[in-house]
């Protein structure tokens, strides 16, 4: 089990390593067509669905930009691409953004793109875990440093437990299913895109506990090389994609599926995309949640940095969203 100080060291090493600053900055000049080039590191296909709708529909040029979108395995990886200069903008989860803020990194949260709260604790019938309290003393697999880890902390807290009451096993998102199948862990929490794989792998031994006590937020963040102008243009494009998603949900699901390039299955996209709430905002609820997560990260992982609301508010940049949709900015 990785102890809190070890976890803190791993997280900060990823965010503060020389590699993150020695790889050069992403292109910021005009692309071949004369439009400004913008690089965007995405992650969650469903949480960041407006990005993929925009990409599939070729919406970027209408706002005068040439966007290059890459997809990273997790929001943590997308964040590191932004911090390391490989991308100007990133689509990340709330916890990686909080971790970067506590580490004092140069980062701006420019929009909360979507919300999701339909979590599952995955387990096996032979482990007889019928409530979160039964996790005490068990081995639980989770991709640490992602918002999935925070989801686990909320599950434990719902039964008055903490990470010290279980053995946390750090696994990649796609390793949780195989670890469960082998019996290496008693339970696991991973991204929803792996739920069906776990059900298939475990067959009649599959069991799950639903949990809605944590709303994961997919954020659009800007790094130091992202200009206000290009960030505003990206947001304007994403708001158009957001409208298209609302007007034609089935078409949006097809766009996301096509952009996943075989990573996602149609049944998963059809089942789970409707469970996300879309709409770019900057709200008091977002700031309150970032404050709660920062307090947890400091206590659980011994991370540095100020966790109070005033300190975290400085990382919210309302300028671009205010320029394209003033009513969506309610945080003060």
Feature roles, as predicted:
Residues 1-11:
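Bacterial N-terminal signal peptides that target proteins for export
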């Amino acid at each position: 089990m990785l102890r809190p100080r070890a976890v803190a060291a791993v997280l900060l090493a990823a965010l503060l390593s020389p590699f993150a600053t020695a790889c050069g900055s992403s292109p910021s000049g005009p692309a071949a067509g004369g439009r400004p080039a913008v690089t965007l590191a995405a992650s969650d296909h469903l949480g960041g669905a407006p990005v993929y709708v925009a990409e599939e529909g070729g919406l970027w040029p209408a706002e005068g930009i040439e966007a290059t979108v890459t997809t990273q395995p997790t929001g943590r990886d997308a964040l590191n691409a932004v911090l390391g200069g490989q991308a100007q903008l990133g689509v990340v989860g709330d916890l990686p953004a909080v971790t970067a803020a506590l580490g004092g990194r140069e980062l701006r949260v420019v929009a909360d793109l979507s919300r999701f709260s339909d979590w599952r604790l995955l387990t096996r019938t032979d482990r007889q875990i019928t409530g979160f309290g039964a996790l005490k003393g068990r081995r639980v697999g989770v991709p640490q440093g992602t918002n999935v880890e925070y989801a686990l902390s909320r599950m434990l807290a719902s039964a008055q437990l903490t990470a010290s009451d279980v053995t946390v096993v750090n696994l990649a998102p796609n390793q949780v299913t195989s670890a469960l199948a082998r019996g290496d862990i008693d339970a696991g929490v991973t991204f929803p895109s792996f739920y069906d794989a776990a059900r298939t792998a475990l067959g009649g031994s599959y069991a799950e506990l639903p949990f809605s006590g944590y709303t994961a937020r997919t954020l659009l963040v800007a790094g130091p090389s992202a200009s206000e102008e290009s960030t505003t243009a990206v947001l304007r494009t994403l708001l158009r994609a957001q409208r298209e998603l609302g007007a034609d949900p089935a078409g949006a699901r097809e766009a996301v599926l096509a952009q996943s390039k075989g990573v996602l299955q149609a049944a998963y996209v059809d089942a789970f995309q409707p469970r996300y709430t879309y709409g770019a905002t900057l709200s008091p609820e977002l700031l309150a949640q970032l404050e709660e997560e920062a307090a947890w990260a400091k206590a659980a992982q011994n991370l540095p940095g100020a966790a109070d609301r005033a300190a975290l508010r400085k990382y919210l940049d309302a300028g671009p969203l205010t320029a394209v949709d003033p009513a969506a900015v309610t945080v003060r």
